[in-house]
Amino acid sequence: MGFREVGLSESEYKRIIELLGREPNDLELELIGVMWSEHCSYKSTRPLLRTFPSKGKYVLQGQGENAGVVDMGEGWGFAFKVESHNHPSAVAPFQGAATGVGGIIRDIIAMGARPSVSMDGLFFGDASLQKTRNLAKGIVEGIGSYGNAVGVPIVGGKTFYSPCYNDNPLVNAFSAGFVRLDKMASSQTAKPGDYAVLLGSKTGRDGIAGASFASRELDEDSKASKPQIQIGDPFEEKLLIECCMDLLDKKLIASMQDMGAAGILSSSSEIAHKSGCGIDIQVEKIPLREADMLPWEIFLSESQERMLLIVEEEKLEPVFAMAKHYGLDCAIVGEMTDSKRYRVYKNGVLEAELPTSILGDTPEILWPAAEPKDLPARQAIELSKLASADPAKDLLEMLPCPNGHRKDAIWEQYDSMVQLHTIAGPGEPAAIVEVPDTHRACVLTMEAEPYKCWTDPYTGASEAMALSLRGLWLTGADALGMTNCLNFASPEVPEKFYELKECLRGLADTCRALDCPVVSGNVSLYNETATDRIYPTPLVVTAGLVVDRDRVIRAGRTKAGDFIYLVGAPEGSLGATRYQQAKDGKPLGKTAAPDAEAEKAFRDRALKTAQRQLANSGRVVAGGGLASALANEAIASGVGMDIELAPRGGVETLLFSEGGARAVYAVSPEKAAEFEAAWSGFPCVKAGKAGGDKFSWQGILTLPLEELAKAFTEEK
């Protein structure tokens, strides 16, 4: 077997020989090749990921574990992470998406947390194509089928359409769970003499080499790679969840690791390396679905619904009894040692022996970066072409566009209320769930700005992060931490690596400026084909805390007679907006970078507004601009509005510009003076009043609310 067959470069192979002092055998080469793959090693992004701020007063566990954990107070932690399942979902939409949900749930289990929340970020191609509709149908059905059956509510997400995702749909699965602080688990606490126990499904050939599959661009051969797609069983996962929760409650587990990419290999080598131990694996003891599997197939299989437990000898018997109670396979497959060696035995014969460091301390690559030659063209914009001759018509066309209309067809397939702790779910700007046994609430926002990242990677990523935080602050939640899924094309092309590097710089700078640590994340590269590539798509999910869940501000609660306020600058930028893209047919123009001081001023006042309950309803100005924010609020509340704001220049800038710390609030007249006082020192203007059955903007447009609602709920 040659090194190129396992995805290694010549320089990497030479480095392996130097580290080992010999040439690896075929099995060792397979093991190293997978662990050094982009998907497992993050070799192209680790230097950049280290620039993220990772410490904060609420951070209990930062990057480097199965998921990040933040402190929710009253003895509760919140474990959360988002992860990609892009390539598998492009090849087998239903199973690819379903197993993406299952995999991220097991990351949460591995922290000792009960999975309590799921969300998904979905990026599809041209909505008018039958191919896109087929992919979207399979992906959404896969998510709903698995999530509903396993009993974890899907409480929100983000869905975005653009032709750049025609051949590369993105499926970013988020999961989270609550854990008592004294029951947190870790993958770094194994000790020599402990036993490695495989719990869950038998190992088969599904998903073999899935990590390598996800480390290269999609082509016709890879699209035919069905064996590299895992097959999920949500009912087995449900049993696995309950068994692991019981084992943790009884303190029977010393350490734990999900079996995700690279299966048994990655889980066992990561536990050994992180714990400073070695491990001896007995391959013949691994329960198999197919008797003729070769050692490399067994180690690289990504069969689902499996966990690797590290168990002290005296606790083996109750662990096996618990597994039997739940009807799960359970087997001792290895033992921790003090050798710092990763050894594979088959029937007593040593098949492979490697230092754990060669599997855990993988090499890094800092690719050359060069500004794309067409970046100035991407940023050029002719404002005269964007003039709105008929604002009412433009608004009615934007609301039903793929990125504007309600996503009921997706949400209705998801169970958002199972577990009975969802306060605000799909269709609301922020998801809100109860913290168990307290009066607290956890708030989650998910954002991505592909258009803006395409025309200006640094500013686009900064705006996505700031937008996610604004959504938290408006509800009354202070940010505890962020997780991200970084979806990009090949890092090997300097212009594409520039986009990656600048997006990550934008995220890091914004998180640092606005005091939001990064606690976990995922990187997905090579999202491209021979003919197309995705826009840079960093997706962020931010978690926040409300101490009193009765003091949150939600959208869609405007009442007749309320004053409508706009806080923040009346106008933003038209560059790379939903309106601009609709007019020009492609994203063009730059957006304004977030102003850290303005963002902090917005944060402080938004938190005060929620704590004092000075508004009945609130909504951040985001995609589609001020007109979309007000129209969505009127539709959701079932009440008309009369808006009196006058444009400074072109009406399209007032109505449809995006960016900046801006929001609309609905305030009862008796609280108006106190609301205005709370926003003193920050732009705040009374924009109009709620009431009636029409959405009117004085001198600009008048539309029946019924017509507006119909446009919003119809697909264009």
Language model feature labels by segment:
Residues 1-6, 10-12, 16-18, 23-29, ...:
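Glycine-/charge-enriched secondary-structure boundary and capping motifs
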Residues 7, 234, 597-600:
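Alpha-helix N-cap/helix-start motif at coil-to-helix transitions, marked by capping-box chemistry
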Residues 38, 154, 176, 664-667, ...:
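Short, hydrophobic beta-strand segments that form beta-sheet elements in well-ordered domains
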Residues 65-326, 332, 336-341, 345, ...:
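Mobile "lid/hinge" segments at catalytic clefts and subdomain interfaces of large enzymes
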